[in-house]
Amino acid sequence: MPVLNLRSDFAEADALPEQMGAIGRRARAAARRMALASARTKDAALKLIAERIRASRDEILSENARDVAAARCAGQTAALIDRLTLDPGRLAAIADAVEKVGSLADPVGRQLAAIERPNGLLIERIAVPLGVVGVIFEARPNVTADAGALCLKAGNAAILRAGSDSHRSAMAIARAMSRGLADAGLPEDAIQLVPTRDRAAVGLMLAGLDGCVDVIVPRGGRGLVERVQAEARVPVFAHLDGINHVYVAAAADLDMARTVLLNSKMRRTSVCGAAETLLVDRACAATHLAPLVQALLDAGCAVRGDAATRAVDPRVTAASEEDWHTEYLDAIIAVRVVDGIEAAIEHIETYGSHHTDAIITENDAEATRFLAEVDSAIVTHNASTQFADGGEFGFGAEIGIATGRMHARGPVGVEQLTTFKYRVHGTGQIRP
């Protein structure tokens, strides 16, 4: 099938670079057609893709069972196997999520700005697709559908490279998506899955496939993201770590602080928006520190703290320098008492990852300062760090979270998968 790239130019290629180059060229050709697709056509395609995923349930679950069995034989962790595993409910949710993307507003063609010049020129800034998006992911087969759907909605073509653990599952989902694209009359090459486990394919994608890849989005662990950021010769939308902080200021309401802290840390400990460090203003430590630490411990969270924190509960263990740098993704948190907002901001600047940081305070001036000075993609006031999510932002879905400064920052949804062009309308003007 086309999604497998089993065409003559691919099947006869002797070398992986030639094979990957063929995928890139087909993606570029598909991207040109996708950029012109109407909103109605794209939405119809998403609905048809969702239907194809549902209709392919037995095939997808069978291939997923093979992936899971192989992962167990390879001794993979329970956490990875859980991320890898699909069941009828999870697969139905994947199909529903694809269909939901179709209900989002079309990001393409929006007028972002209009300028009328004194000489009569009308200049418009218009949203257009990025082009070809390369997505490299590991054990979550749902990324195949999520990333493909978001790229399609934004008028892009996608080249997807699944990890070895999820390869069979991803291929089965991609086959269903290819059928849905064909049903809608859109190019099947708009969503291609790299049909090899060879890791050299990743390097070729990072090199840009001879100019065919416009941006790379990695979805996976630190090792993958580090490699992508180090080797990519095209722009990258990614975050390396989620070392997120909750700062409880002197003017914080204790009940609110406790509720927000517990949600930030314990709602889901393994997500990138989970809090990893609690900072407490020394001015309120006498009233706030012990109750907050007790709440964490009672919720099953291990606490590693500085001397002031260890003094309030014997269950607290000593925090090392490494703890302030650590993204636990587990029921563990580091706690430090700081001398006011300036020290809190300095700590976040030194140890943070520019992902998501929160302040709990009833002092508006203090909140304003924190929101302005903390240099993170997402900064919250009296709200959980776990709102770091495209769905919670009203984006409908996200392809990831970016902490860089160029183009996309924070949740990367369909709007962030577009760029812009200028349209200049004249009546014969020439430049003097």
From Swiss-Prot:
Catalytic activity: L-glutamate 5-semialdehyde + phosphate + NADP(+) = L-glutamyl 5-phosphate + NADPH + H(+)
Pfam families assigned to the protein according to its UniProt record, in alphabetical order: Aldedh
Keyword flag NADP: yes
InterPro entries recorded: Ald_DH/histidinol_DH, Ald_DH_C, Ald_DH_N, Aldehyde_DH_dom, G-glutamylP_reductase_CS, Glu-5-SA_DH, GPR_dom
Sorted UniProt keywords: Amino-acid biosynthesis, Cytoplasm, NADP, Oxidoreductase, Proline biosynthesis
Record localization: Cytoplasm
Biological function: Catalyzes the NADPH-dependent reduction of L-glutamate 5-phosphate into L-glutamate 5-semialdehyde and phosphate. The product spontaneously undergoes cyclization to form 1-pyrroline-5-carboxylate.
Name assigned to this protein: Gamma-glutamyl phosphate reductase
Organism: Methylobacterium radiotolerans (strain ATCC 27329 / DSM 1819 / JCM 2831 / NBRC 15690 / NCIMB 10815 / 0-1)
Record lineage: Bacteria, Pseudomonadati, Pseudomonadota, Alphaproteobacteria, Hyphomicrobiales
